[in-house]
Amino acid sequence: MDHIQYAKNVLDEGTLNNLQQFCLQHYEEIPIYNFARKTEKPKNYLEEVIRDLIGYDNHLEYWVRDDTQATLMHVDANELQAKIDRYKYGEEDPHMIKEFPLNTHILYVFIDPKMEGGKLLIMPEQEYIPGRKILDTTFRPAEGSKIMVVKPETNHMVLFDKPLYHAVETVTNTDVVKHRCALMFSSWKKI
């Protein structure tokens, strides 16, 4: 499974502390979707951290999620266009051309060691199924499908370079754990 990689101790202690402080204290101020062209210098701390990790070879999409709720099984793609279609027309255009990033990175910024649940689920053998919607609330893994389970840990990162279906479980002990903070970013060849 060369298309899925896992790294530990991704950031040095100072960078990690600064990133945690920024994401946890300013989460509400961070736009939901962010994009940076490969020719642009970083406009903010998040872009600085990401560019230090992956360089400037490709365009960059990134977002932060500090949430204890589940996300449905999905693939990373041109979701923004699908959301615009839903807003304008009430549904995703079934004929919309699906575009996928070169890769997806999930950097765990802050994970409480007491967290129960909140695991990342990846279907390592299931790429996007042509004809399905990007924002597909009806997708369910077929019985017997292989699912890789990743227990998030602070300063660890998961990377995959195929449009794989993935999801996040609900954190089950939200009486104790208030944050499950991750920085996600994807490289794009074209805009």
Indicate residue ranges for each PLM-predicted region.
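Catalytic core of non-heme Fe(II) oxygenases with the double-stranded beta-helix
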Residues: 59-61, 65-191
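Non-heme Fe(II)/2-oxoglutarate
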Residues: 1-80, 84, 119
